[in-house]
Amino acid sequence: ILLLVAAVLLSTQVMVQGDGDQPAYRNAVPRDDNTGGASRKFLNVPRESECPWRPWCG
């Protein structure tokens, strides 16, 4: 189950990062807020709680 949750979080984070490349999304949200706030807005999960066990979150 833990691996499934990790896979879902990783795939969702990749989708969020992919959305950041779209011009419409870039116009709606500043790029400075994209790295810190995108996951919090789309996943409703604080990025700080993911980082300790997800070294690839940056």
Curated annotation (Swiss-Prot):
D-tryptophan found at: 53
Signal peptide: 1-18
Chain positions listed as propeptide in the UniProt record: 19-47
Subcellular location, record wording: Secreted
Disulphide connectivity of cysteines: 51-57
InterPro entries membership: Conotoxin (IPR004214), Contryphan_CS (IPR011062)
Annotated Gene Ontology cellular component terms: extracellular region
Location of 4-hydroxyproline modifications: 52
Single GO molecular function: toxin activity
Further remarks about this protein from its record: Exists in two forms, due to cis-trans isomerization at 51-Cys-hydroxyPro-52. The cis conformation is the major form.
Entry's family note: Belongs to the O2 superfamily. Contryphan family.
Protein name, UniProt field: Contryphan-Lnv
